[in-house]
Amino acid sequence: MTKADLVHEIAAQTGVDKQSVLAVIESMKDQIKNSLQTGENVYLRGFGSFILKKRAAKTARNISKNTTIVIPEHYIPYFKPCKELIETVKG
């Protein structure tokens, strides 16, 4: 399902026009990004959590130059579904 499909389905289900639904989805996406950027996790009860996971520093190889590089410690965004969502998908 694409964002356009999601907008269409929500608009059809709620009776709200597509522009308003798209604005809400974009705003939600921006708020989640902003929260994660500032180090805050986002918890959506009954759906899941958008959290930051720490990746440890590691050594990697650049095979084209045959050199070793150090990738510093960093954080990546991660979605952790709630148990209810996991059970729904499992069937």
Give the role of each language-model region.
Residues 1-91:
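Strongly charged
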